[in-house]
């Protein structure tokens, strides 16, 4: 009977300590960013590649025949391209590792469908605006949509010229 009581006390103590931990609130991941550009595939493809180059995005793979461009991972301040959520009511600040994959496919002869997928996680973060940057734990982040919107606005402007 003594060992059951001890086990219960240990369990209650462990649950009590776990309840004191900070709650991590993850941002909801948005769906992939999709749009259509009113220009042919070749013109749009050239505009996408030129725009990514102008924005100095490191590229890992370009496959024109399949319409895929994959960026390499690069560092971005949290809350510019990546929303990394909150811990205990404090917004995460610091740096995030982000990467994007752009898919393009012809839509008839005068249009191109584009989809941008994103993948993001914290690299060095802190709770709130002060404190030491930490590398662990790593939190998954969601796109703010800013990179995608800026990219496609620049592509649309480029194909109009």
Write out the residue ranges for each language-model feature:
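Ser/Thr-rich, low-complexity intrinsically disordered terminal regions
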Residues: 21-161
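C-terminal motif of bacterial Sec signal peptides marking the signal peptidase cleavage site
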Residues: 17-19
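Extracellular glycan-targeting catalytic surfaces
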Residues: 14
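Bacterial N-terminal signal peptides that target proteins for export
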Residues: 1-10
